[in-house]
Amino acid sequence: MRITAKAGAMMLFCLLAVSALLPVWAADAGSQKAIDTERSVLTVRVYKTGLFSAFAHDHEIGAPIQKGVLDEGKSTAEFVVDARALRVLDPDVSDKDRAEIQATMLGPKVLDSEKFPEIRFHSTEVNRISEGKWTVHGDLTLHGQTRPVKVDVERKNGRYRGSAQLLQKDFGITPVTIAGGTVKVKDEVRVEFEFVAR
């Protein structure tokens, strides 16, 4: 088959264009990194309120990351937590009280973790504030409800640190109340994390 000079030039142009794009695709594919679940930490802080709150405790809850990915090239992030794996870490309570708090947290009155075992976050928009700082908007699925959340993130020494404020009622969870409402859990909880990418 005889190739004209014009056709040959077009083929050469196409080859050059594809060659120019290949490094971009390669960089894009390589920018996605898995979250190191062994070295990453996600903590939920739950606070008390009410008339006799001085006699109650704030709660610290560990939420092990099951899996997740970070992609600075595409400005995306997502992770999954198994709700059944959440653990109450409160150091100032007895083992018996800690077990009771955990049973309440995982049970049908709060997280209902057997019915809703997955907690998932997926970013929808990432805005760069300055070098190593971002505001991340995304969808959080918790207790079978998906709601938009905003997360402030900072990268330092290879670690991504951040926090967000959530309202339990936004996810269909009624804050725990005891002693006729004289001691109760605040609707607002704070989520803190430190992620390390592999």
Can you say where each PLM-predicted feature lies in the sequence?
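N-terminal secretory signal peptides that target proteins for export/translocation
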Residues: 1-6
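Bacterial N-terminal signal peptides
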Residues: 9-23
